[in-house]
Amino acid sequence: METFTSPKTMVENPQFQLQKQRNSNDLENAAIDAPIIEHIKHVNQLPYCFTLQCCHGHFLYNGQQDSQNNDPLPISDSISKVEYRIAYIAFCVDFNDQGKLFLDSLKQITSIDNKYIKFCCAECLWERQVNSYAI
């Protein structure tokens, strides 16, 4: 994802249901990181949101340089440095009461560890889909 910005104020989006339907038609399981496919399917069943992008996150270290791997980080004394590639999920949220409650719940997730968990907008997503947020 590109430029993260502070969360924007939701706006009315009369095309939400059509966009949600179009998105579900275009969703390809092969493009979703295997460990989170079922979670993404469940989220997309909610009537007030749909996912735009997601990434499970990937560990890179000496001996594992595949930036698309889904392998868990092994327990090993030989690994001295790990690069963790960002994990995120981006949603489009409907401008209704359920959507607003969902958005408020997402914002609260950052209280788990606000140093590493962020709630934001991604400018590149908002430009093509209003009411898009990432965590």
Predicted regions: what they are:
Residues M1-I135:
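Structured alpha/beta or helical-core interaction and ligand-binding surfaces enriched in interleaved
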